[in-house]
Amino acid sequence: MGILDAQPAADIEMLISANCHIGSRNCELRMEPYVFKRRADGVHIINLGKRWEKLILAARIIVTIENPTDIIAVSSRSYGQRAVHKYALHTGAREAISSRFTPGSFTNYITRSYKEPRLIIVTDPRTDSQAIKEASYVNIPVIALCDTDSPLQYVDVAIPTNNKGRHSIGLIWWMLAREVLRLRGTLANRDVEWGIMVDLYFYRDPEETEKDTESEQKALEASGNPAGQFGSVPVTSDWEIAAQSTGAGIITNVASNVQSVGNWDENFGVETGVPSDWAADSIQQSEIQHAQNWN
């Protein structure tokens, strides 16, 4: 039980700050062993010690898979889509199925999205029920992040946690990836900190990202230092002035030449003595040649 008692105090502080211990008002029968108590407002509190035990168990199961590409992370919930992609990137998993799960991905070999994983990890058994159901048909083990109201049917390992908050989901996926890397030997021991920040696993709203970008651009414009953005650099260099002056000179020269030439046909006829009507000239030459042939 040494490894179970070695939960760092910093991890406990992060779990509490991310509200990983806050469950829902409802509680499934098979989730009662993971509930610490029930508050006066009806919200169930999840036992963090039980969560740590299940997290270690899930990490050990993941490490037993020889080929990491045989593991698939699934998240139909938007708050977990960024987390599953980061988990697949850092642990070498085959891929992450985010957004909607395509029916038949595990059972219908005719579809292009057909896969044969040896293990799947889901964010929410309720939103990812299609993936869990298909995994049960082909005997694929399932690890799931389960809240107090999550159904545990066809779930082999349940990690009790709050699977509805953006911070709690990202933190649990980050801890799971860190523990997997430690068991594989990528990280020496628990005293060595992982260089990947937990913020990378958090969901980011696209609107908030756009607002941050706009605020940065406004700050650069206000400071008068546009070095951070190429698009904000005003093009007022000597090249533009030289190009404008050169272009103006060319236009002036062309206009003067046109005025000096005047009528092209008149000048052409005066200088060379050749009529400007090319069609009449060709007719006269043909008539002269025809008369010579008769003679």
Curated annotation (Swiss-Prot):
GO terms for cellular component: cytosolic small ribosomal subunit. The keyword Ribonucleoprotein applies. Residues 208-231 are annotated as: Disordered. Coiled coil: none annotated. One of its GO terms (biological process) is ribosomal small subunit assembly. Signal peptide: none annotated. Its main location: cytoplasm. Residues 208-219 have a biased composition (Basic and acidic residues). Pfam families: 40S_SA_C, Ribosomal_S2. Keywords: Cytoplasm, Ribonucleoprotein, Ribosomal protein. GO terms for molecular function: structural constituent of ribosome. It is found in: Cytoplasm. It comes from the Eukaryota. Belongs to the universal ribosomal protein uS2 family. HAMAP family: Ribosomal_S2_euk. Component of the small ribosomal subunit. Mature ribosomes consist of a small (40S) and a large (60S) subunit. The 40S subunit contains about 33 different proteins and 1 molecule of RNA (18S). The 60S subunit contains about 49 different proteins and 3 molecules of RNA (25S, 5.8S and 5S). Interacts with RPS21. Required for the assembly and/or stability of the 40S ribosomal subunit. Required for the processing of the 20S rRNA-precursor to mature 18S rRNA in a late step of the maturation of 40S ribosomal subunits. NCBIfam families: uS2_euk_arch. This is Small ribosomal subunit protein uS2. The gene is RPS0.
